[in-house]
Regions:
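N-terminal secretory signal peptides that target proteins for export/translocation
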Residues: 1-4
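Bacterial N-terminal signal peptides
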Residues: 7-19
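Residue-level detector of flexible, active-site-proximal loop/helix-junction positions
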Residues: 15, 55, 131
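Sec/Tat signal peptide C-region and signal peptidase I cleavage site
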Residues: 20-24
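Short solvent-exposed beta->alpha transition segments
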Residues: 27-35, 45-92
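Exposed beta-sheet edge and beta->alpha loop/turn motif
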Residues: 87-137
Length: 137
């Protein structure tokens, strides 16, 4: 009985130790996405552009062009009413944070944020639309 309790405790401690880095990643990732969402709501595209990874910055070049893309292609993100963080997962070596975004009109949208850790902390390297998980279920 005592050996079983010791094994159980060891498993719990190992699980906690392994999950701690994920929790730390999750906090940093959420802070990055939240910071960009706050900047979008304030129409502060300079700050929002600062959360973009180097590949995105290179693609758009300026915060003005980035802002135009967001306003036209991601209006629910630009003027979001609420953001809910869903699953954080690793796919093919990349970390993807799924979010549910509530738009100003009350509609819900699901997006996946590919996150990269840089010398400046977590940054957003890609965003893609996801199908509504409730559709077709």
């Amino acid at each position: 009985m005592k050996a079983a309790a010791v094994r159980f405790l060891a498993i719990v401690l190992i699980t906690l130790a392994l999950s701690a880095p994920v929790a730390a990643q999750s906090d940093g990732i959420r802070a990055t996405i939240s910071g960009q969402m706050d900047a979008f709501r304030a129409d502060d595209f300079d700050t929002a552009f600062g959360f973009a990874a180097p590949n995105i910055k290179s693609m758009f070049g300026t915060s003005d062009r980035f802002g135009t893309m967001v306003r036209n292609g991601y209006p629910m993100v630009w003027k979001n009413a609420n953001v809910r963080y869903l699953e954080l997962r690793e796919l093919s070596g990349n970390l993807w944070q799924m979010v549910q975004v509530e738009a100003q009109d009350g509609s819900f949208h699901y997006l996946d944020y590919m996150m990269v850790e840089t010398e400046n902390g977590w940054q957003i390297a890609a965003v893609q639309f996801l199908p509504d998980p409730g559709v077709g279920a």
